[in-house]
Amino acid sequence: MSNNPHIAWTIAGSDSSGGAGIQADLQVFRAFGLHGCSITTALTAQNTKGIQSIEPVYNLFIQAQWNSLINDLPPTVIKSGMLANAVEKLADLLASNPTIPCICDPVLRSTSDTSLLSEKAFSILQKRII
C-alpha cells in the first residue's frame, strides 16, 4: 500500500453517528477509488438530533497519528474538516510539508448550531491555513 499514489488523508473530528467527519470522508475517498487514512482531531458524541459532547484530541496524539502515517502512507492530498483545538498544530504540520496539497473544509458550526471553532482558532485558520 505504501507505493499507492492515490492516498487521501482526512484530518477531522469523529462523528459517532457516521453522518459526517472522518467517517463520511473515508466513505467519499473509497467511492472515488482512493485509499483513505485519518487523523482524528476530536471525538464527538452525537446523533441525528445534535451533538451531546465533544472531546478534543491532544496535539501530542495528533502528532503521533501524523508520524505513524507520513513515512508509510504519505498522502497525495489532505482534506481537513473539524479541527477543534488542532488548528495551530495542523498549520505547523502543513508548513513543514509544503508540497502536500490541503483542501480546507472548516467546520465552524454543526448542523444543530453548536459552535465547533473558537474565534481565536478561526483567526489562526485564516492566517495560516486558508
What do the predicted segments below correspond to?
Residues V77-S80, A84-I130:
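Conserved beta-alpha-beta core of the PfkB/ribokinase-like small-molecule kinase fold
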Residues M1-V77:
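Small-residue (G/A/S/T)-rich helix-start motifs and N-terminal tracts that mark the onset
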